[in-house]
Swiss-Prot record:
GO terms for molecular function: glutathione transferase activity. This is Putative glutathione S-transferase alpha-4. SUPFAM superfamilies: GST C-terminal domain-like, Thioredoxin-like. Its EC number is 2.5.1.18. Conjugation of reduced glutathione to a wide number of exogenous and endogenous hydrophobic electrophiles. Glutathione binds at residues 48, 55-56, 69-70. It is an enzyme of class 2 (transferase). Coiled coil: none annotated. Residues 87-207 form the GST C-terminal domain.
Amino acid sequence: MMTTPTNSKPQLTSLRYRGYVQFAQVLMAFHGVDYDMCYVDKIDDQLRKELKFDQLPLFRETDGFKLNQSLAITKWVGDKYDFIGKSSKERALVVETVACVHTDIVMPAIRSVLTGQGRDRIINVVIPRYFGAFEKVLTENKYLACGDSLTIADLYCYVAYDYLGHLGFAPDHLQGKFPKIDCLKNHFESNKNVQEYLKKRPDDNEFFKNLPDWLKKDSCPTMSC
């Protein structure tokens, strides 16, 4: 059963896996946001009434404002904490990176785990192409948005990098190949709140191995979060 949201904290509701919601979780941990995390095993009728797109995650602000899409949630939180770039060019580069991570890296990786297909492409094309591009930018600039401060672009890069390792996509290919991204990973994981999140986060390998029957019926379960 879903817990009742409090009035004093935002609430994030998700299935018990990392998926796309982990970007918002790491973002809020990094900024020390105090919120209620509510994991559910299914979407019941009561919860479904609150979902604009019949999917999770669902984010509720203290004033009742709701968002039902992971990219919108991270944009909302990033905007509140001045984490989306200082200029229009930086913000455009943030959008470019976030879209790339979401669509070109994480989505095909999850799909590959679910279908058992496309693993070689993740290892031989996706990892070198996209993380190689991010590594090049970080070699030439301090941050991915080419400004003087971290943004959600850097966070998305780190989380995706860590996630592909978790899903078992050739950790040998990742180890030592992208030193600038490794530095980015170390920076985020040195944050005490992020460290606490890492201790408690779900294991997606177990989740996908025991995928609920109702999600198996979804023609594209990767889009549920």
